[in-house]
Amino acid sequence: MIHKTLEKHSDIMAREYNIADIGSGISPVTPDISKTVFIELEKQAVDFLRKQGLNAVKGDITHLSFQKESFDAILCSEVLEHVPNYKKGISEMARVLKKNGLVIITVPIHQKYWKDDDEFVGHCRRFDPETLAKDIKASGLQIVERKPIGSRLERWLTWNIVKIARRKGNKEMNANKVKLFAFYAINTLLLQFIKIAAALTSEENSSIILFAAKKN
Protein backbone atom coordinates (compact mmCIF):
# COMPACT_ATOMS: atom_id res chain seq x y z
CA MET A 1 0.00 0.00 0.00
CA ILE A 2 2.80 2.43 0.87
CA HIS A 3 4.65 1.51 -2.33
CA LYS A 4 1.54 2.09 -4.47
CA THR A 5 0.85 5.42 -2.79
CA LEU A 6 4.41 6.58 -3.47
CA GLU A 7 4.16 5.57 -7.11
CA LYS A 8 0.77 7.24 -7.49
CA HIS A 9 1.74 10.64 -6.13
CA SER A 10 5.49 10.89 -6.69
CA ASP A 11 8.12 10.22 -9.32
CA ILE A 12 10.81 9.34 -6.79
CA MET A 13 10.68 5.63 -7.62
CA ALA A 14 12.07 6.48 -11.06
CA ARG A 15 15.10 8.41 -9.84
CA GLU A 16 17.60 8.66 -7.01
CA TYR A 17 15.80 9.33 -3.76
CA ASN A 18 15.94 8.98 0.00
CA ILE A 19 13.23 8.15 2.50
CA ALA A 20 12.74 8.64 6.22
CA ASP A 21 10.74 5.88 7.90
CA ILE A 22 9.73 7.28 11.28
CA GLY A 23 8.75 4.94 14.09
CA SER A 24 8.82 1.76 12.04
CA GLY A 25 9.83 -0.40 14.99
CA ILE A 26 11.04 -3.78 13.75
CA SER A 27 8.59 -3.78 10.84
CA PRO A 28 9.75 -1.27 8.19
CA VAL A 29 7.11 -0.10 5.71
CA THR A 30 9.55 1.45 3.22
CA PRO A 31 9.66 0.07 -0.34
CA ASP A 32 13.49 0.17 -0.39
CA ILE A 33 15.43 -0.31 2.83
CA SER A 34 18.73 0.58 1.14
CA LYS A 35 17.55 4.14 0.50
CA THR A 36 15.90 4.67 3.87
CA VAL A 37 16.89 6.27 7.15
CA PHE A 38 14.99 4.65 10.01
CA ILE A 39 14.22 7.05 12.85
CA GLU A 40 13.25 5.37 16.11
CA LEU A 41 12.65 6.66 19.62
CA GLU A 42 13.34 3.31 21.29
CA LYS A 43 16.97 2.21 21.54
CA GLN A 44 15.88 -1.43 21.39
CA ALA A 45 14.37 -0.89 17.94
CA VAL A 46 17.42 1.07 16.73
CA ASP A 47 19.75 -1.73 17.84
CA PHE A 48 17.59 -4.37 16.15
CA LEU A 49 17.49 -2.48 12.84
CA ARG A 50 21.22 -1.85 12.91
CA LYS A 51 21.85 -5.56 13.43
CA GLN A 52 19.95 -6.11 10.19
CA GLY A 53 22.42 -3.79 8.46
CA LEU A 54 19.97 -0.89 8.19
CA ASN A 55 20.66 2.82 8.60
CA ALA A 56 18.86 3.50 11.87
CA VAL A 57 19.16 6.48 14.19
CA LYS A 58 17.62 7.32 17.54
CA GLY A 59 15.33 10.30 17.19
CA ASP A 60 12.17 12.05 18.29
CA ILE A 61 9.58 13.02 15.69
CA THR A 62 9.00 16.32 17.49
CA HIS A 63 12.72 17.22 17.33
CA LEU A 64 14.19 15.68 14.18
CA SER A 65 17.97 16.08 13.97
CA PHE A 66 18.05 16.74 10.23
CA GLN A 67 18.37 19.89 8.16
CA LYS A 68 15.33 21.25 6.39
CA GLU A 69 14.45 19.62 3.07
CA SER A 70 16.48 16.46 3.73
CA PHE A 71 14.12 13.77 2.41
CA ASP A 72 12.22 13.04 -0.80
CA ALA A 73 9.61 11.06 1.10
CA ILE A 74 8.63 10.47 4.72
CA LEU A 75 6.67 7.48 6.01
CA CYS A 76 4.90 7.79 9.35
CA SER A 77 2.74 4.73 9.91
CA GLU A 78 0.89 4.29 13.22
CA VAL A 79 3.08 6.79 15.07
CA LEU A 80 1.30 10.10 15.68
CA GLU A 81 -1.28 8.50 17.98
CA HIS A 82 1.59 7.85 20.42
CA VAL A 83 2.86 11.45 20.38
CA PRO A 84 1.44 13.94 22.93
CA ASN A 85 2.43 16.95 20.80
CA TYR A 86 1.58 15.39 17.45
CA LYS A 87 1.18 18.78 15.73
CA LYS A 88 4.88 19.45 16.35
CA GLY A 89 5.61 16.07 14.79
CA ILE A 90 3.70 17.03 11.65
CA SER A 91 5.47 20.39 11.40
CA GLU A 92 8.86 18.68 11.81
CA MET A 93 8.08 16.27 9.00
CA ALA A 94 7.08 19.20 6.80
CA ARG A 95 10.35 20.94 7.68
CA VAL A 96 12.64 18.08 6.69
CA LEU A 97 10.62 17.14 3.59
CA LYS A 98 12.02 18.37 0.27
CA LYS A 99 9.99 20.57 -2.04
CA ASN A 100 7.62 18.36 -4.06
CA GLY A 101 8.30 15.60 -1.56
CA LEU A 102 5.60 13.28 -0.24
CA VAL A 103 4.69 12.36 3.32
CA ILE A 104 2.46 9.36 4.02
CA ILE A 105 0.71 9.18 7.38
CA THR A 106 -1.50 6.42 8.77
CA VAL A 107 -3.28 6.67 12.12
CA PRO A 108 -6.14 5.01 14.02
CA ILE A 109 -9.35 7.04 13.89
CA HIS A 110 -12.68 7.52 15.65
CA GLN A 111 -12.97 7.62 19.40
CA LYS A 112 -15.91 5.21 19.20
CA TYR A 113 -13.34 2.46 18.60
CA TRP A 114 -11.29 3.30 21.71
CA LYS A 115 -10.72 0.26 23.91
CA ASP A 116 -8.28 -0.78 26.61
CA ASP A 117 -5.84 -2.09 23.99
CA ASP A 118 -5.32 1.49 22.79
CA GLU A 119 -4.13 2.43 26.25
CA PHE A 120 -2.04 -0.73 26.56
CA VAL A 121 -0.02 -0.01 23.41
CA GLY A 122 0.49 3.63 24.39
CA HIS A 123 -2.04 5.49 22.29
CA CYS A 124 -2.74 9.05 23.40
CA ARG A 125 -5.76 9.30 21.12
CA ARG A 126 -7.68 8.03 18.15
CA PHE A 127 -7.88 10.86 15.62
CA ASP A 128 -10.82 12.72 14.18
CA PRO A 129 -10.07 12.68 10.42
CA GLU A 130 -11.25 16.25 9.82
CA THR A 131 -9.12 17.62 12.64
CA LEU A 132 -6.03 15.79 11.43
CA ALA A 133 -6.61 17.01 7.87
CA LYS A 134 -6.68 20.60 9.13
CA ASP A 135 -3.48 20.05 11.12
CA ILE A 136 -1.68 18.62 8.07
CA LYS A 137 -2.75 21.59 5.94
CA ALA A 138 -1.72 24.01 8.70
CA SER A 139 1.85 22.68 8.44
CA GLY A 140 2.01 23.85 4.83
CA LEU A 141 1.37 20.46 3.23
CA GLN A 142 -1.21 19.80 0.52
CA ILE A 143 -3.26 16.62 0.93
CA VAL A 144 -3.31 14.61 -2.30
CA GLU A 145 -4.97 11.45 -0.99
CA ARG A 146 -7.24 10.62 1.92
CA LYS A 147 -8.17 6.97 2.17
CA PRO A 148 -9.76 4.74 4.86
CA ILE A 149 -7.67 1.59 5.22
CA GLY A 150 -9.21 0.00 8.33
CA SER A 151 -12.49 -1.67 9.22
CA ARG A 152 -14.54 -3.12 12.06
CA LEU A 153 -12.85 -6.45 11.29
CA GLU A 154 -9.37 -4.95 11.76
CA ARG A 155 -10.47 -3.32 14.99
CA TRP A 156 -11.99 -6.52 16.37
CA LEU A 157 -8.92 -8.59 15.47
CA THR A 158 -6.48 -6.08 16.95
CA TRP A 159 -8.42 -5.87 20.20
CA ASN A 160 -8.56 -9.67 20.55
CA ILE A 161 -4.89 -10.18 19.69
CA VAL A 162 -3.89 -7.73 22.42
CA LYS A 163 -6.41 -9.25 24.83
CA ILE A 164 -4.94 -12.73 24.32
CA ALA A 165 -1.39 -11.43 24.56
CA ARG A 166 -2.07 -9.64 27.84
CA ARG A 167 -3.12 -12.92 29.43
CA LYS A 168 0.52 -13.99 29.20
CA GLY A 169 1.39 -11.34 31.74
CA ASN A 170 1.88 -7.58 31.51
CA LYS A 171 5.55 -7.77 32.46
CA GLU A 172 6.41 -10.08 29.58
CA MET A 173 4.30 -8.22 27.05
CA ASN A 174 5.48 -4.76 28.05
CA ALA A 175 8.96 -5.88 27.02
CA ASN A 176 7.69 -7.22 23.71
CA LYS A 177 4.85 -4.93 22.59
CA VAL A 178 6.55 -4.53 19.26
CA LYS A 179 5.87 -8.22 18.54
CA LEU A 180 2.12 -8.05 19.13
CA PHE A 181 1.25 -7.39 15.53
CA ALA A 182 3.70 -9.81 13.92
CA PHE A 183 0.65 -12.01 13.56
CA TYR A 184 -0.51 -9.79 10.71
CA ALA A 185 2.84 -9.95 8.95
CA ILE A 186 2.90 -13.75 8.77
CA ASN A 187 -0.73 -14.49 8.08
CA THR A 188 -1.15 -13.62 4.40
CA LEU A 189 -4.67 -15.01 4.12
CA LEU A 190 -5.93 -12.96 7.03
CA LEU A 191 -4.27 -9.87 5.59
CA GLN A 192 -6.23 -10.35 2.38
CA PHE A 193 -9.50 -10.48 4.32
CA ILE A 194 -8.51 -7.31 6.18
CA LYS A 195 -7.72 -5.52 2.89
CA ILE A 196 -11.03 -6.57 1.36
CA ALA A 197 -12.94 -5.41 4.43
CA ALA A 198 -11.10 -2.07 4.37
CA ALA A 199 -11.90 -1.56 0.69
CA LEU A 200 -15.59 -2.01 1.47
CA THR A 201 -15.57 0.29 4.52
CA SER A 202 -16.43 3.99 4.49
CA GLU A 203 -14.30 6.56 6.28
CA GLU A 204 -17.07 6.98 8.85
CA ASN A 205 -16.78 3.32 9.85
CA SER A 206 -13.06 2.82 9.23
CA SER A 207 -10.63 2.24 12.09
CA ILE A 208 -7.52 3.56 10.29
CA ILE A 209 -6.94 6.30 7.73
CA LEU A 210 -4.14 7.13 5.31
CA PHE A 211 -3.18 10.67 4.34
CA ALA A 212 -0.69 11.43 1.57
CA ALA A 213 0.47 15.05 1.40
CA LYS A 214 2.95 16.99 -0.73
CA LYS A 215 5.16 19.96 -0.03
CA ASN A 216 4.78 22.51 -2.82
Q: Whereabouts are the PLM-identified features?
A:
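Conserved N-terminal segment of class I S-adenosyl-L-methionine
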Residues: 1-69, 73-77, 90, 126, ...
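S-adenosyl-L-methionine-dependent methyltransferase catalytic module, highlighting the catalytic core
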Residues: 5, 84-92, 96, 102-212
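A generic secondary-structure micro-motif detector
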Residues: 35-36, 79, 83, 121-122
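Active-site micro-motifs of SAM-dependent methyltransferase domains
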Residues: 63, 81, 111
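Residues lining the SAM
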Residues: 77-80, 106
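Generic C-terminal helix-cap and adjacent flexible tail
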Residues: 215-216
